[in-house]
Amino acid sequence: FLLFITLFTAAFWRNTPFFLVPFGAAVVLFSRPRDVPIVTADKIAAEQKKGLLFRPVDFILSVLLLGAIAFTVLRGFVVLDCPLDACFNYIYQYEPYLKDPVGFPRVMMLMYLFYAVPLMVALIYGLNFPGCGWMLDWTIFFAGAMAQAQWCHIGASLHSRTPFTYRVPTDKWWPVISLNVLLAAVPSLLALRCLTSPAYFMKPVPKGQTSEDKKMK
């Protein structure tokens, strides 16, 4: 028992920095002044007048986010033991790791279901309605969170110490890994889109004035 307590304490303190650093990074990210690029009011107005169908990149990202939501909801239902045939087929034919008794995959899928899904809905809203300046920050935050979470999930499902019966079936390896990598990549692609062309998400400024002029006043 004393050995268990000693090992638990050592493991706890070794992992504490990895638990605290993301909170510190989030505080720094959301508290620092945003570096607003110089964009004219005319360009902002022109971008914000375009409908979703006239912004093909945003349209594709919206479709990908909808697919990610559907995939996340499916896996959430799977770990909640939903009796649907789709859930049964998925857990036994594609990702048996989700029923690993250690509980880690179940917790991950529930976190996705209750935290990632609402945020993805908000991001779809931001892609459809102009002036959502929070997209410039939250997309970066979400991209980092999903990349880390998916790295852990994919790595654990393929790890040699995971019982063989819970690993991804050989014949389903490519579709399962591709879907999981895509789930990690979509938020990063969205963050890159917001970073490289932020005009659609910026608040309108008086005509003829740049966003930099507004910031300086």
Which residues does each predicted region cover?
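Interfacial helix-start motif at the membrane-water boundary
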Residues: 95-115
